[in-house]
């Protein structure tokens, strides 16, 4: 059986006074080690920082136009992704006294306005360039959707 993971994403804007380079410096030089250590301590399985510069957004917009797609291009500068087994992991991180120090560190770099949070589960079908977790009969993820999201199901337990 292939296990589904929860993914929390937090999409941030830089402060107007913070350059793209300074935002990257904050994330990689000032924040990454402390955040990664804290998240690993509490059971986070993966922690990613996703950077989106104006050049990347412009390139995506050009690609979108070439497809004739009606996409909205996300304008956030830094998105943090955490992959976890359950919501209790996030509660444990938030209750750790070290977590409170993150706000002070972020203050010169990240805006607290318009942070977009998303929580859902992940089903992976390509890893390392190879098709995974799928057969001719479909997805290998079990239980099926109804049982997974239903009352008493794995999702309910993970969110408890």
UniProtKB/Swiss-Prot annotation:
Q: Pfam families from the xrefs?
A: EthD (PF07110)
Q: Which InterPro entries match?
A: EthD_dom (IPR009799)
Which ranges carry the EthD domain?
Answer: 24-100
Superkingdom of source: Eukaryota
According to its UniProt record, this protein's enzyme class is oxidoreductase
Q: List the disulfide bonds.
A: none
GO MF entries:
oxidoreductase activity
Keyword line: Oxidoreductase
Upregulating conditions = Expression is positively controlled by the cluster-specific regulator ATEG_00326.
Coiled-coil spans in chain: none
Q: E.C. number, please?
A: 1.-.-.-
The record's comment on protein family reads: Belongs to the tpcK family.
Q: What does the UniProt record say this protein does? A: Putative oxygenase; part of the gene cluster that mediates the biosynthesis of isoflavipucine. The PKS part of the PKS-NRPS ATEG_00325 probably assembles a triketide from an acetyl starter and two malonyl-CoA extender units. The poly-beta-keto intermediate would then be fused to the leucine unit by the NRPS part. The resulting amide would be liberated from the PKS-NRPS through reductive release of the linear PKS-NRPS product from the enzyme complex.
What name has this protein been given in UniProt? Answer: Putative oxygenase ATEG_00330
């Amino acid at each position: 059986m292939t296990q589904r993971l929860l993914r929390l994403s937090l999409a941030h804007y830089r402060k107007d006074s913070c350059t793209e380079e300074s935002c990257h410096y904050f994330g990689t030089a000032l924040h990454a080690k402390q955040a990664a250590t804290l998240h690993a301590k509490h059971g986070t399985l993966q922690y990613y920082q996703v950077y989106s510069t104006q050049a990347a957004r412009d390139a995506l917009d050009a690609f979108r136009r070439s497809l004739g797609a009606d996409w909205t291009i996300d304008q956030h500068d830094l998105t943090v992704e955490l992959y976890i087994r359950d919501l209790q992991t996030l509660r444990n991180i938030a209750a750790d006294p070290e977590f409170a120090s993150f706000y002070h560190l972020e203050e010169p770099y990240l805006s607290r306005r318009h942070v977009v949070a998303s929580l859902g589960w992940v089903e992976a079908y390509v890893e390392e360039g190879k098709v995974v977790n799928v057969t001719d009969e479909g997805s290998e993820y079990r239980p099926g959707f109804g049982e997974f999201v239903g009352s008493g199901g794995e999702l309910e337990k993970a969110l408890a």
